[in-house]
Amino acid sequence: MIERGKFRSLTLINWNGFFARTFDLDELVTTLSGGNGAGKSTTMAAFVTALIPDLTLLHFRNTTEAGATSGSRDKGLHGKLKAGVCYSMLDTINSRHQRVVVGVRLQQVAGRDRKVDIKPFAIQGLPMSVQPTQLVTETLNERQARVLPLNELKDKLEAMEGVQFKQFNSITDYHSLMFDLGIIARRLRSASDRSKFYRLIEASLYGGISSAITRSLRDYLLPENSGVRKAFQDMEAALRENRMTLEAIRVTQSDRDLFKHLISEATNYVAADYMRHANERRVHLDKALEFRRELHTSRQQLAAEQYKHVDMARELAEHNGAEGDLEADYQAASDHLNLVQTALRQQEKIERYEADLDELQIRLEEQNEVVAEAIERQEENEARAEAAELEVDELKSQLADYQQALDVQQTRAIQYNQAIAALNRAKELCHLPDLTADSAAEWLETFQAKELEATEKMLSLEQKMSMAQTAHSQFEQAYQLVVAINGPLARNEAWDVARELLREGVDQRHLAEQVQPLRMRLSELEQRLREQQEAERLLADFCKRQGKNFDIDELEALHQELEARIASLSDSVSNAREERMALRQEQEQLQSRIQSLMQRAPVWLAAQNSLNQLSEQCGEEFTSSQDVTEYLQQLLEREREAIVERDEVGARKNAVDEEIERLSQPGGSEDQRLNALAERFGGVLLSEIYDDVSLEDAPYFSALYGPSRHAIVVPDLSQVTEHLEGLTDCPEDLYLIEGDPQSFDDSVFSVDELEKAVVVKIADRQWRYSRFPEVPLFGRAARESRIESLHAEREVLSERFATLSFDVQKTQRLHQAFSRFIGSHLAVAFESDPEAEIRQLNSRRVELERALSNHENDNQQQRIQFEQAKEGVTALNRILPRLNLLADDSLADRVDEIRERLDEAQEAARFVQQFGNQLAKLEPIVSVLQSDPEQFEQLKEDYAYSQQMQRDARQQAFALTEVVQRRAHFSYSDSAEMLSGNSDLNEKLRERLEQAEAERTRAREALRGHAAQLSQYNQVLASLKSSYDTKKELLNDLQRELQDIGVRADSGAEERARIRRDELHAQLSNNRSRRNQLEKALTFCEAEMDNLTRKLRKLERDYFEMREQVVTAKAGWCAVMRMVKDNGVERRLHRRELAYLSADDLRSMSDKALGALRLAVADNEHLRDVLRMSEDPKRPERKIQFFVAVYQHLRERIRQDIIRTDDPVEAIEQMEIELSRLTEELTSREQKLAISSRSVANIIRKTIQREQNRIRMLNQGLQNVSFGQVNSVRLNVNVRETHAMLLDVLSEQHEQHQDLFNSNRLTFSEALAKLYQRLNPQIDMGQRTPQTIGEELLDYRNYLEMEVEVNRGSDGWLRAESGALSTGEAIGTGMSILVMVVQSWEDESRRLRGKDISPCRLLFLDEAARLDARSIATLFELCERLQMQLIIAAPENISPEKGTTYKLVRKVFQNTEHVHVVGLRGFAPQLPETLPGTDEAPSQAS
């Protein structure tokens, strides 16, 4: 790391109070402590004087008059010195460890002005052991010493080996050495720089915030960018000279420029208007045709909308009519649903009562069963009693009739007897006395038939009897059931009525079972009926939409026809879509192709124009790009040859000019350095001595001296030797000849003259042979002769160079034209004519548009037919599945029939529901009604008679059967005597008879007991019947109410009613939705019709206006075309590339040209009047008259002797060839010299940014600096608003102010000043000239505003002003500012001095007692951080803990005052962490 230079000591010699005193300076802080008048300010004044020995600046205010602004005459310095020689010297050591002593010799000048003479000097190479006081003093004895004057000091130092002493005649040189050696931070080139440095030191010395520094911080902190200013000045000077030359050329070209300007602007003015009118005429025709097409299309759209409006209005009326019916149906459905719900609630009540009745019925049946069981037991008891009676009777009969069979013989006898008995019994029983065994078989069949009949009758009566016996108690119950079902009737009718009721019950039950199927069937038929009605509605709607009535049989065929039509239309639509896509694609391709051709057409036309011009210029016809490139190669070869020849001529011309310039030098010196060397050596050039030699002798003397003819003749070569040492600025070979210039001759050489040559014997062993030069240059006469011949040659060369330059320029212009043509137009120049292709494509586009329009119309009709067919098919798809319904004419009748059957079934169901239980109970006991208990005795008698009859018939049949069976027994007559009775059997029968009689007695007693219990059961049964009848009556009332409601309340009735209501609601909602849609569509259609009507009216108006305009403009356009053709200017005016520009662009082009023409013809009365007349937009032919007038005017002014053409354009091109070369050369030179405004802005802005960054880095070093309430110090750098706006305009909006920077009358500085005034008109520039203002604006420092801010207490950041700070705070803040300035100077100067030098850094502070201890500590810390030396002068309040402290006490001894000095090194303990760069020495006394 480079060490920073340091001030080692300050030496005061013969100052007031200090005879010879050296103050060793601390590396950081040196404190001068002492009371008032102790010499602290004198010490600092000596330091400042040695640092800045400028009497115009030195002004020590604390020793001058109080309140004075100018101070005393000596400005405080004269009184600080003693009489005689005084010195102030600074001993320093720089970063290179070089010891340098700088100082001043001061001496009071006698006189009333109290002046002081100052001489600065410097000493280098002084050994470290030599003290400064030893140099400038001489010890006379132990108590006396003498101060050496400056010349003795110089001699003393020169006597010392390695020591260099330099005395300076100017302060600038003194400061330059100090800067180079790293003693001061900035190079002080001028008095202004010294003033700034002194103001810095002065501000440091007296403390506080220096207004002189704060007001001009820019000058202190920002380096001057003089290189930029110098570059601008050189640029402006060169530009000024160049512009003067260009102005001269422009004056020469005035006629040509005027002609060219007039022709170009007149052509632009008239051609733009001509082509605009042509374009407008075409546009108006296209618009008229377009208006007509749109008018036709709008009329068709309006008619279509009107038809659509009528259809939608009709449909809306239909929906409005249907909405009322649907609302009524919906209300009826809602009412029906409410009735169904009421009926269902009634039905629920009925079901509850029926449940109660069922429960009572069950209890009644149970009680009936109990009664029946009791009756059965009663009947059993009766049967048992009767059986006992019968058994008794039978036993009695058996006892009477029974015979006992014996053994086999007895059995035969018995059988015989039995057969006889059987025959007798048969005769008796059958009442057939004539009956025999043989005839018994025939009578058997007869009596068997009787038996069968009697058995059947008996069985019937037995059944009746049995039933009567078992159901005697149920007859009343059955009778009551029949009465309940049928009503009152006679008891004898009960059986027949019951059977009829049972048969009717079966039928009713069968019908009741059909209720659900009938209901489902009815629902199905009703659904089909609704579908039939919907189908009829759809069919009616379909017929209405088709506009024709169709039979049902025709619908399928129509459906197939529509399907076929849809298929064909779909194919047609699909094909039409593809065809339309193909047409549109072709149209888009055509449009794209036309657009690309229209974009290419201007390029192609420009290429054709360029190609025609090239053909006219070179006289060649080009048919392909190969021809152009081949001709360009030939042109390049010609150009190369011409350039080579021109360069050779130019090089020869330059060589001639250089030779003329060299020969024109005074004294014949070809090298200016020889003149300087001759003056330095005190000699004379040899060519000056022989300047008067004649032209004839010139070849001889030139050959005689040979290479030494440019030698210098000096009186004494020995005196030149010391000058030759270290000589570098001289020719490679420098000849010196000793001799007297006043009497010099050629005797110095031994010469032998030969034929046109000489032999010079330079030495015994060295000769030189030189021939006479063909063109001698030795002597003024020879040089003048040579110059004359060179001038003649130069004239020839100049003329040849001009001719060649003209040819090269012409060739280059032609080459440039070819190059431009190749670069810009070659690719398209030989392509086909885009305009012809555009015309073909436009005709094809028109055909496509017409075909597309026809196709759209056809496609629209097909689409309408397709939609209609689709709607028809959709409707038929809904109708065809219902054709069978439509064809079913009996559906309504079947519905009525099923409804009637359902009513019957429901009646039967209600009958079954009402009487089903009674019938079910009646059916098992209906038989009891066959016999009335009141006829039971008769029935018994009938049964007994029938039984007897059956028994008799059986006996008769049995008897006959027995006879028939015993027919063989009649032969056993012999065994009859053997039959006998059996007395034992009779005894057993009697015993059984007694037992049977006892059993009969017991059965009769049981019968009487059970009869009483049966009576109790009958009473319970009667109560249950009463409750049942009451419930039954209530149930009948509810059923009658349900019948009065008139609604079938089955399980699905509510769901069907709700579905019906929801269907009607959905239909009503759909109808309303469709009605709303139709109303909206109708409103939109009406609005669309209104819009179309308004559009139609506007189109009609626009069409008729456009048509009238086209017709009106046609007459004027015909007059214009006739005038153009008559005057032959169509080629100039009909610029086809302008046909592709818009009307606004052409009008703008014409207006711009008109403005330029007004200025161009302002001095020509005739053209001015014609131009004014041509401005009438209603008379376009007058513009043609103006163009013809301009051409005529230019033809009259063409010099036919120079330019042999009748065309002004060709004349201008020929005039331009010669002058353009000079203009291009000077313009290119100007462009090389000129600098753009954007570059200036960038340079200034970059410089500002660099300096702002530098200031920001400086601010970082002061962030932790605090004094009193001041917590931090910073420097704000802002760009002035007015200057920032200037930079923005220069960089971004410079095109708007090119009138200033492109002006030939203004330099760049003046243009910059004018721009500043234009941007800031409110600023008063005073008496300063624009050049001065512009030069100030080129200095970036004038763009910046700088101010110092402090962070003080609770106030935050505020501007640093002395009035806002305490004294100590102002001192600390001012010191911070000064440190920042010093750092800035070092950064600025780093690039100017050596990289290995870091300059000394030292500041002062007088009267430091105004700072508190904390601020003093802050200063110490600042010095440590910045490696800065600080000299503080203060009273006794400074504690010598750090740095070096000198105690100064002024004493008087024997009328002589001197200052007693005691120095102390800091004795404070070293901190644990020291700041970088600090190195405190141990405490010691000095």
Curated annotation (Swiss-Prot):
Primary residence: cytoplasm
InterPro entries linked to this entry: MukB (IPR012090), MukB/SMC (IPR050308), MukB_hinge (IPR032520), MukB_hinge_sf (IPR042501), MukB_N_dom (IPR007406), P-loop_NTPase (IPR027417)
GO biological process: cell division; chromosome condensation; chromosome segregation; DNA replication
Subcellular location per the Swiss-Prot or TrEMBL entry: Cytoplasm, Nucleoid
GO cellular component entries: cytoplasm; nucleoid
UniProt-annotated stretches for the region Flexible hinge: 666-783
Free-text note on domains in this protein's UniProt record: The hinge domain, which separates the large intramolecular coiled coil regions, allows the homodimerization, forming a V-shaped homodimer.
Official protein name in the record: Chromosome partition protein MukB
Organism expressing this protein natively: Escherichia coli (strain ATCC 8739 / DSM 1576 / NBRC 3972 / NCIMB 8545 / WDCM 00012 / Crooks)
Taxon lineage: Bacteria, Pseudomonadati, Pseudomonadota, Gammaproteobacteria, Enterobacterales
